[in-house]
Swiss-Prot record:
The lineage of its organism: Eukaryota, Metazoa, Chordata, Craniata, Vertebrata. GO terms for molecular function: signaling receptor activity. This is Tumor necrosis factor receptor superfamily member 5. The gene is CD40. Disulfide bonds join C26-C37, C38-C51, C41-C59, C62-C77, C83-C103, C105-C119, C111-C116, C125-C143. It comes from Canis lupus familiaris (Dog). It holds the Pfam family TNFR_c6. The chain crosses the membrane at residues 195-215. Its main location: membrane. One of its GO terms (cellular component) is CD40 receptor complex. Glycans are attached at N153, N180.
């Protein structure tokens, strides 16, 4: 009875030695072929032949324009990425047998996804928002609202929020408060404002007076010319009639008019004198 368990143990160990269990897993950087672990090909190389009991795995280098970037058992290499200029792409870094080509977008554009297969325009931050992070070839613009004390009045992919103007540092007073879209408006202090406004008003009044004086001087010239015209010229323009040289004298005689004839002396009788 004691020998039976010993016999079972003996035959079990013998069968295990003759018929070993097939492998189901291999070490890192190995792959399983027909229950045998073969070494993988390194990056930049592809598989040509699997290993045998006494022969190691056969690999060969990827051709130009191809690559494999990991340890592998691939029989074909991958083609390098093509950076299509029609999509706004250009080569940022040339590919090798171990790495793929890196594409990036032209200026003002960024990739639409992680693979950078196409490009799109950078976003603009509208008024009230400033640029927190400038866009790159692989990322879009990041905008941030302008906090209190700052403003942005343009749409831009570069401009950050600007601080409000400090009126006090300029010796001015605040006329209008700022917002996230507009700057503070400054103005002169009341006393300074008067010193500025009064000379301006005086200057305007002086100009008005000078203009008025010039206008009056121009208007008076023709009037003076008429008032002091040469009398000889008037006579030439308007000659006197011939009978007006020696007008007929008239006297009264007994309340009756007496006409003095031309060429005779005028005499009055004694009675008339009395």
């Amino acid at each position: 009875m004691v020998l039976l368990p010993l016999r079972c143990l003996f035959w079990g160990s013998l069968l295990t030695t003759v018929y070993p269990e097939p492998r189901t897993a291999c070490r890192e950087k190995q792959y399983l072929v027909d229950s045998q672990c073969c070494n993988m090909c390194p990056p930049g190389e592809k598989l040509v032949n699997d290993c045998l009991h006494t022969i190691d795995t056969e690999c060969t280098r990827c051709q130009t324009g191809e690559f494999l970037d990991t340890w592998n058992a691939e029989r074909h290499c991958h083609q390098h990425k093509y950076c299509d200029p029609n999509l706004g792409l250009h080569v940022e870094k040339e590919g090798t047998s171990e790495t793929d080509t890196t594409c990036t977008c032209d200026e003002g554009l960024h990739c639409t996804n992680a693979a950078c297969e196409s490009c799109t325009m950078h976003s603009l931050c509208p008024p009230g928002l400033g640029v927190k992070q400038i866009a790159t070839g692989i990322s879009d613009t990041i905008c941030d609202p302008c906090p209190i004390g700052f403003f942005s009045n343009v749409s831009s992919a570069l401009e950050k929020c600007h601080p409000w103007t400090s009126c006090e540092t300029k010796g001015l007073v605040k006329v209008q408060a700022g917002t996230n879209k507009t700057d503070v408006i400054c103005g002169p202090q009341p006393r300074l404002r008067a010193l500025v406004v009064v000379p301006i008003i005086m200057g305007i009044l002086l100009v008005v007076l000078l203009v008025s004086a010039c206008i009056r001087k121009v208007v008076k010239k023709p009037e003076n010319k008429v008032m002091y015209q040469d009398p000889v010229e008037d006579l030439e323009e308007f000659p006197m009639p011939p009978h007006s040289i020696a007008p007929v004298q008239e006297t009264l005689h007994g309340c009756q008019p007496v006409t003095q004839e031309d060429g005779k002396e005028s005499r009055i009788s004694v009675q008339e004198r009395v």
